Amino acid sequence: MIHQKYPINWKKKDFSIMIFCSIPNIATGILIKGGSNHFVVDPGDGILRDLNQEIGMKQIMDISDLFITHGHHDHVGGVWALLTYMRVMHKTSPLSIHYPEGCVEIESIYNAFKKVYSKTIPYKISLKVIKQSKNFKTKNITVRPFPVIHKEYLHDGVRTRQVPALGYSFIYDGIKICYGGDTAYCEDLVKQAKGADLAIVEAGHEDDTPDDMHMTMSEAKSIGESAKEYFLVHVPE
């Protein structure tokens, strides 16, 4: 295991990932680089600041894709800021936002942004709803979305419901990074993480406080150890 300390950096050949942070209920933010292309995964609060410090304005303008695992605030809290910054700085190349079917948070953010700035958006935004686990390619990476199991509490704080949630495998030049997002233990993540060059696995609970929303440390480690390298993220502080 590689010990958690943010930001986390990993690189193999010309494929790299930087996890700016992954703190439950606060924020997540991930930057993936494949060659000269940049992609953002789960742009939580603070992502605009982190991207500016790491890659700067010009390369932010060149970002072509956002990948959303689910709609909880700690994973999408920076979307509005990122879209607005791209507008203010006159991005002209298109932006695709990939997200699970039923993720109303992303659709609501997009609709509100479009309503507020309908006459002054210089770039095209395409919502790409993911309805099935099927490989697709964008720029120079192959992406494999897969279903995961994540829930949220209802208003009574007792009952729960399933939320639309995905994990993603990113493949570039034969190198595979698997990111599970927020999830309970699930077989689809087990399959995707096995043999990956890097697995990023959430460990939202200690072993003595298991639930059906997040994995325990032991569960997360068992999945991570099936990959060549792994990070445990989303560990409560």
How would you describe each model-predicted region?
Residues 1-178, 227-229:
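Binuclear metal-dependent hydrolase catalytic cores
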Residues 176, 184-237:
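Cap/insert and terminal regions of metallo-dependent hydrolase folds
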